[in-house]
Amino acid sequence: GDVYKRQGVDRDPQAGKVGMASAAGCCHSFTPDGRCITLLKVLLSNACCYDCAYCVNRSSAQTKRATFTPQELAELTVDFYKRNYIEGLFLSSGVIGSPDHTTELMIECLSYLRNELLFNGYVHAKVIPGTDPDLIDAIGRLADRLSVNLELPSSTSLTKLCPHKNAETVTKPMSFIHRLRVSEERQLLEAKNASKGIVKSAGKSKGIVIPTQKQIIKEGLALRSNCLKNTFMRSSRVSSGKRSFSPAGQSTQIIIGASPESDNQILHLSQALYQQFELKRVFFSAYIPVIEDHRLPELDTPVPLRREHRLYQADWLMRYYAFSPDAVSYTHLRAHET
């Protein structure tokens, strides 16, 4: 149960509001009792000024474009919720003009959804790299979870396949989200201690102190395995229900098979993301060849679904059973298995 509750946010029904949220994770996740959580996974717009090689909605693609109005998408979400089609919203968008303008439209949609339609269910929102920090703060107050897609496993591949993106623009919002969550956790803990009459010792740091390896073991926050490493799961001292900014944390997605990186490289990257930004999940997405481009695999290349599955298994071993990337990538993940 606790394994799943760390992935989402609990919010009870409230008088006069529509819906609730259960700490069961993201799109198409399963609860311990086997229940599938369904989210409306939708783009505000498939129009995009970026030209990422692998994307069917890239600016150079000859495809029909459609854009919801913020109010239209909010009303659609509530309508689907009332019909019991969905239990929440997973909102993303192509880049309409600029990251800031696109995020402003997403904020308008979520603000109408929360404040006018009184939707109290789960919301996951994508953050576009390059978005102004103030807008990230604003959308994080409306969404339960934020995610910034890393897209590709190396800066080289990102530069090659996504000419409008680079590693810095992707990791910068991740770092900002992490800092805001840590800051809010510190403030909530200080308020809790103050209400109990607990006074901090002089000279102590006001920041959140990441536990040392010995502290983690002593506090029982980590399982251990034959590789004798700590897991990446730092238990928050503040429940998600008390947070106002991205209470269910942040995640990211990596496309598998569009670029030449090995499973070992991908898992080492995942490890770094968990440790540096305290991500809740790294999602893996098998690349489906649908676009002819000399930078991409041939159209008849098999979709690496088994590889995606094995990476998820390895990710689980790393996060909950303390395996290192090197311990699983060779023994359990045959190189580029398809």
Residue spans for each PLM region:
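Short, charged beta->alpha transition segments
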Residues: K41-L43, Q71-K82
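Short acidic, glycine/Ser/Thr-rich loop/turn "cap" segments at secondary-structure junctions
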Residues: N57-T63, L89-P99, V123, L158
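Short Fe-S-cluster ligation motifs
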Residues: F80-S92
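Hydrophobic residues within beta-strands of alpha/beta enzymes
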Residues: C55, G88-L91, L146-V148, V282
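Flexible, acidic/Gly-rich N-terminal and inter-domain linker regions that tether
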Residues: G1-A47
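Conserved AdoMet/S-adenosylmethionine-binding subsite of the radical SAM
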Residues: A74, G97-W316, Y321
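Conserved small/polar residues in nucleotide/adenosyl-binding loops
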Residues: V3-Q7, T331-T338
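Canonical Radical SAM [4Fe-4S] cluster-binding loop centered on the CxxxCxxC motif
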Residues: V42-Q71
